[in-house]
């Protein structure tokens, strides 16, 4: 079973408070999401492998470490996931970026894939799928399905806020995927919103409904 990591770093929790605040405007909301994504990327990459190299300092030759050639990819779930990409790329600028677009079928209420674009070397990369919210888990499960059926073998899922129902759904369908969360909230309400949550992340990030 994949592990669930909840980040309690003070900076993440501080910024998350303002992300939740209904008084936070679009510009500040977007900036805060970007900043938290960077902080979470720092934590999520903690186990990247290193290799020793020789480097010439102004004083003498020295042994030091670099990341051991790991190929990484970031895949936002459209549209709200886009707001987390730049924050991650600040730390991992060489990562390739793919996209998964989903919409909810008005009759079945199930997510339907309408757009997928991934790096050509998908089988060789470790992917971080990002979406600010993990509510019912339907979109996350479908996005992970999309990556796996195209050859992805090593995937992590990262979100700002999750409901227990969403975590359970992802673990049920993708027990090999680790989940990284800034906050695990109480539950979903009758409309499928995370409680207490932060509202609709996409609407707040882009100023549109």
Curated annotation (Swiss-Prot):
Residues annotated for 5-phospho-alpha-D-ribose 1-diphosphate binding in this entry: 79, 104, 131-139, 200
Cofactor note: Binds 1 Mg(2+) ion per subunit. The magnesium is bound as Mg-PRPP.
Gene3D superfamilies: 3.40.50.2020
InterPro entries xrefs: PRibTrfase_dom (IPR000836), PRTase-like (IPR029057), Upp_B (IPR034332), UPRTase/APRTase (IPR050054), Ura_phspho_trans (IPR005765)
GO biological process, one term: uracil salvage
The keyword Glycosyltransferase is assigned to this record: yes
Regulation: Allosterically activated by GTP.
Known pathway: Pyrimidine metabolism; UMP biosynthesis via salvage pathway; UMP from uracil: step 1/1
GO function term, MF aspect, one: uracil phosphoribosyltransferase activity
Record-listed uracil binding positions: 194, 199-201
EC number in record: 2.4.2.9
Signal sequence coordinates: none
Cofactor: Mg(2+)
UniProt keyword annotations, A-Z: Allosteric enzyme, Glycosyltransferase, GTP-binding, Magnesium, Nucleotide-binding, Transferase
Transmembrane segments: none
Uppermost EC category: transferase
Reaction catalyzed: UMP + diphosphate = 5-phospho-alpha-D-ribose 1-diphosphate + uracil
A Pfam family reported for this protein in Swiss-Prot or TrEMBL: UPRTase
Entry's family note: Belongs to the UPRTase family.
Protein purpose: Catalyzes the conversion of uracil and 5-phospho-alpha-D-ribose 1-diphosphate (PRPP) to UMP and diphosphate.
Name assigned to this protein: Uracil phosphoribosyltransferase
Natural source organism: Bacillus licheniformis (strain ATCC 14580 / DSM 13 / JCM 2505 / CCUG 7422 / NBRC 12200 / NCIMB 9375 / NCTC 10341 / NRRL NRS-1264 / Gibson 46)
């Amino acid at each position: 079973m994949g592990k669930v990591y909840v980040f309690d770093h003070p900076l993440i929790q501080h910024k998350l408070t303002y992300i939740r605040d209904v008084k936070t405007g679009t510009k500040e909301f977007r900036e805060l999401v970007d900043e938290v994504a960077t902080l979470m990327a720092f934590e999520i990459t903690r186990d990247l492998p290193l290799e020793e190299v020789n480097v010439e300092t102004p004083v003498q030759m020295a042994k030091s470490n670099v990341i051991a050639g790991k190929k990484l990819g970031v895949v936002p779930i459209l549209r709200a996931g886009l707001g987390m990409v730049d924050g991650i790329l600040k730390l991992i600028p060489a990562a390739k970026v793919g996209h998964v677009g989903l919409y909810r079928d008005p009759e079945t209420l199930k997510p339907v894939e309408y757009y997928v674009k991934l790096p050509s070397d998908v089988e060789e990369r470790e992917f971080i799928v990002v979406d600010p919210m993990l509510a019912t888990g339907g979109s996350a499960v479908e996005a992970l399905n999309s990556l796996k059926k195209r050859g992805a073998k090593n995937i992590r899922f990262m979100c700002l806020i999750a409901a227990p129902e969403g975590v359970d759904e992802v673990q049920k369908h993708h027990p090999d995927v680790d989940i990284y969360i800034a906050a695990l909230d109480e539950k979903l309400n009758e409309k499928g919103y995370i409680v207490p949550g932060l509202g609709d992340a996409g609407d707040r990030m882009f100023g549109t409904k």
